[in-house]
Regions:
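Short, cationic-aromatic polyanion-contact patches
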Residues: 10-14, 66-85
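Conserved segment of winged-helix/HTH DNA-binding domains
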Residues: 77-102
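C-terminal regulatory/oligomerization modules of transcriptional regulators
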Residues: 107-140
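Short helix-capping/hinge SLiMs at alpha-helix to coil transitions
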Residues: 9, 22-28, 41
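Glycine-centered, phosphate/nucleic-acid-interacting loop/turn motifs that mediate DNA/RNA or nucleotide
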Residues: 59
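Short acidic, hydrophobic short linear motifs in intrinsically disordered regions
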Residues: 28-37
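Short helix-coil junctions and helix-kink-helix linkers
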Residues: 36-45
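Short alpha-helical segments that sit at the start of domains
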Residues: 1-19
């Protein structure tokens, strides 16, 4: 899965919400910490616990004990998941064509001039990094 360990299985939309809560907590987090981040969802503590159990089975979190409490920590960073998730969407919706995705975002997403300029700056920086890498001679 694009830079993520092969042992990981895809997340459902609800599991993704729980992972966002785990990432938002200081690690390791207790179920109560995670519940607090999910307060607006209206989920019962047992529901959150069930999601955490499934996430552990899928390899997304690991659990342990701290005193009387179970604690949870993500096994993957939010950034790594974000990159993987965006790559999946890019492949699924745009056939892997980054330029088509950028055109669609620029023309139909309501991005303001400031956001577009910021995106251009990032793309230019990445382009320069790629050029530097291409010019690198490990033997010279």
């Amino acid at each position: 899965m694009y830079g993520l360990p092969d042992r990981l299985r895809p997340l459902s939309a609800a599991e993704e919400q729980v992972m966002l809560a785990v990432w938002a907590c200081r690690e390791p987090a207790t179920r109560r910490d995670i519940d607090e981040k999910l307060r607006g969802k209206g989920w019962a503590p047992a529901t959150v616990l069930n999601f955490l159990y499934r996430l552990e089975e899928k390899g997304w979190v690991k659990s342990g004990k701290q005193g009387n409490h179970n604690i949870y920590a993500a096994t993957v960073t939010q950034r790594a998941y974000g990159v993987w998730s965006m790559r999946q969407r890019l492949d699924t919706l745009f056939g892997g064509d980054l330029a088509a995705a950028v055109r669609a975002l620029g023309s139909e997403s309501g991005c303001g001039q400031s956001e577009l300029e910021q995106a251009m700056k990032v793309l230019e920086e990445k382009h320069l990094e790629a050029e530097e890498y291409d010019l690198y001679d490990p033997y010279g």
